[in-house]
Amino acid sequence: MTVNINELVKEHGFCVVPTEEKPFSLDEARFNFLAYLEDYPKMGFSFVKVANELVELRRKQEVYRLFGQCFLGAFVIGEEEQVFLLCNQEGREVFQESRVYVNSSLHTFVSSYSLFLSSIFLLKAKFYEMKQDEVEEIAANLKDQVLSLEKPLEQELPFWEHMAYLIEDDGIVLRDDLFHILNKEQ
């Protein structure tokens, strides 16, 4: 995963805290939720794969551990293990916030993100014959499934609601564009 840390520091006023590298234990390897997160570069989703790659960010009393990013900003784990999105410029335009609640835990984020990816692959499976009501059903199912993971629902889930909206509104990138493919060939 490549995140422009300088951009995060400049935009949000964080400082990066150097972390001490620790050996990876067998239990950490067995229960490593980060390893389940698949990158989806078509929409800028990328993640660290092991806990010792987490980057600690501090600002006044706030402490976060950076573990991923997407086209809307950086995914971080807060002090109470909740997942937030620290919004970049595009994310701030969408959410009108600099920080957005995403999920109650990394475990729930992994499940939610996996459901999101499965929705993308459902769209890909029938892209040439899918009707709008089927697309809307995929978006509604994503919202319902993510909401069911967050029982009891403590906060709204604007990030996942926006992902469902993008599915409905044909805002999900399903393939590499021709320009990208041609540039790769040269």
Write out the residue ranges for each language-model feature.
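Generic preference for well-ordered secondary structure
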Residues: 51, 93, 97-100, 133, ...
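Compact, glycine/acidic-enriched structural inserts
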Residues: 85-127
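An amphipathic alpha-helical core segment
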Residues: 114, 118-158
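A surface-exposed partner-binding patch
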Residues: 1-88, 153-186
